Structures are given as C-alpha cells and as structure tokens.
C-alpha cells in the first residue's frame, strides 16, 4: 500500500516553493499540528531558481496525541515526545517554476521511514500550483512493521496534504 495526494493552491510554483523553504511557515505549521519545530535549515540559505536545494526539518510531537491511532501492541512506544526527522532534496526550477523533491520522513521511535516524491507544477491555466505527493512507508519493528506501515501510510499522506493546505493559508497572510 502507498499514499498519493494531489492538491491545487492558487499561488505560483515559485511562491509555493518559497513558502516550503521558509522557517516562519514551518513554525506556523508546527503550531497548527501541535508539534515543536526543533531544527530547520535550507541549503543554500537563499536559493535561486537555478539551485538544487536541501531542506532539513526536525519536529517533535506528543506521542499521546496520536497513540490511539496505532495498533494496541505499538501504543506503548508512543510515550512522551516523538521525534520526526524530515529531509527534502529539491531540483532546480524548470522554466515554468516547476520543481521536484525526494523527501524522507523518519520516526525513529517506530523504526519507520516514509519516502516520497513531491512535485510542484503550474496549473494548465497558470492560476495556481498543483502539489503532488506520492510515497510509501516501511517499519522495521519485528512482527509489527508491516501493520505499522499500513496504518502510517494514509496518515503520512494526510499530513503532507495538510501541510500544503496550511501553506495556502500561510501564503494568504504573507
């Protein structure tokens, strides 16, 4: 099983990418998701359209906030603060502003890793950006890993889609 989410927002790919690589947006999103943004970095610090870009995001969430969505055998692992490590490797922009990224999201507590591709490209009429996210989750916990991955995949897809919706709201304010 894998996840695939597609969202369209009324901003250019350049604006969407600029938001996704902005620390203030990630603070805003972390607050909305009841998480803490522990670390955020973008290399190069002020990317141009010709640059490939690396993004590193470290968040923590309260495990009890989502433990009830996990299988009972795994709920005991979701205690206290749970670290979420996210890295993104973005391509340089195409002439129309489109960009692609390979993203990895790790949750060490669950021995789980999600890999995804993120695509930003202009809508056909140029009125916005289509954000496509597609990927899968693997967990290496013996006997339970496949069940964890199966339950996590839709949640990761929803999280990434929710992040895009938060970006739309944030861009409206900035």
Model-flagged regions — what are they?
Residues 63-91:
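Helix-adjacent hinge/juxtasegments
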Residues 6, 45-47, 78, 108-110, ...:
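Generic marker of residues within folded, mature protein domains
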């Amino acid at each position: 099983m894998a996840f695939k989410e597609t969202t369209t927002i009324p901003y250019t790919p350049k604006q969407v990418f600029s938001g996704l690589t902005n620390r203030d947006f990630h603070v805003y999103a972390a607050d909305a998701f009841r998480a803490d943004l522990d670390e955020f970095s973008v290399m190069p610090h002020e990317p141009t359209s010709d640059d490939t870009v690396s993004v590193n995001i470290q968040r923590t969430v309260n495990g009890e906030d989502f433990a009830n969505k996990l299988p009972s055998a795994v709920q005991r692992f979701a205690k206290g603060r749970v670290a979420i490590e996210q890295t993104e490797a973005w391509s340089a922009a195409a002439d129309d502003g489109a960009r692609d990224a390979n993203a990895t999201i790790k949750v060490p507590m669950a021995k789980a890793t999600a890999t995804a591709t993120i695509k930003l490209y202009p809508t056909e009429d140029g009125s916005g950006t289509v954000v496509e996210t597609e990927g899968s989750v693997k967990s290496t916990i013996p006997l339970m890993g496949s069940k964890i991955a199966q339950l996590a995949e839709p949640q990761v897809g929803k999280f990434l889609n929710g992040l895009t919706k938060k970006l739309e709201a944030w861009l409206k304010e900035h």
